[in-house]
């Protein structure tokens, strides 16, 4: 946060995946174009009960991980956070409303996923475990894609979209089009989803 500085002092840090020693939990915070390379490298590092929590944008992330790690425990997830890299080693978080939303791995029903929830809660990180994670991932995808498309079309910021009726109308049109795509694969979003998204953007 702008008025709060947090210094992290990890017990171990590396940029080489093969130096990880049988982790219990792997949080994937990478760009989607690195996903295949990273998951292939993880094959020889993780153990059978390692839980993987991917925080990447996209609706196909879990399937892509399963391709390289077919037997792994994966908690599908998405994250809402307003932050950017201020300078090397420093991330500026501009809002205290960050949230991780995750679901259970349906192929591993006997795993106690609530223990993961406890880890984040104890670290004061907002974490929500939900039953219908596919819906939540689609919500995030539509949110990001719609704003990105509209911002690119008008070469403007989030704020400019929300304060201009023409731009905001375009945003709503893009929202509805992507919502129809979701519906075509049986993902149904709430009727007031657009209004909910505007509140989140504010």
Segments (PLM) and residue ranges:
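Short, solvent-exposed loop/turn elements at beta->coil junctions and helix N-caps
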Residues: 81, 132-135, 198-199
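Conserved N-terminal glycine-rich FAD pyrophosphate-binding loop of Rossmann-like flavoproteins
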Residues: 1
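Internal alpha-helical scaffold of NAD(P)-dependent oxidoreductase catalytic cores
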Residues: 45, 68-73, 88-192
């Amino acid at each position: 946060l702008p008025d709060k500085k947090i210094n992290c002092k990890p017990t171990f840090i590396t940029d080489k995946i093969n130096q990880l020693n049988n982790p219990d939990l792997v949080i994937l915070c990478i760009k989607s174009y690195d996903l295949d390379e990273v998951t292939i490298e993880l094959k020889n590092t993780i153990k059978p009960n390692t839980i993987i929590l991917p925080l990447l944008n996209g609706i196909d992330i879990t399937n892509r991980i399963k391709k390289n790690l077919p037997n792994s425990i994966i908690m599908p997830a998405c994250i809402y956070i307003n932050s950017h890299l201020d300078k090397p080693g420093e991330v500026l978080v501009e809002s205290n409303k960050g949230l991780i939303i995750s679901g259970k791995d349906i192929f591993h029903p006997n795993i106690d996923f609530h223990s993961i929830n406890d880890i984040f809660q104890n670290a004061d990180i907002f974490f929500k475990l939900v039953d219908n994670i596919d819906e939540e991932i689609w919500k995030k995808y539509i949110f990001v894609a719609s704003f990105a498309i509209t911002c690119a079309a008008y070469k403007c910021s989030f704020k400019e979209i929300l304060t201009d009726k023409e731009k905001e109308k375009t945003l709503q049109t893009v929202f509805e089009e992507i919502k129809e795509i979701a519906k075509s694969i049986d993902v149904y979003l709430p009727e007031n989803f657009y209004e909910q998204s505007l509140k989140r953007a504010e």
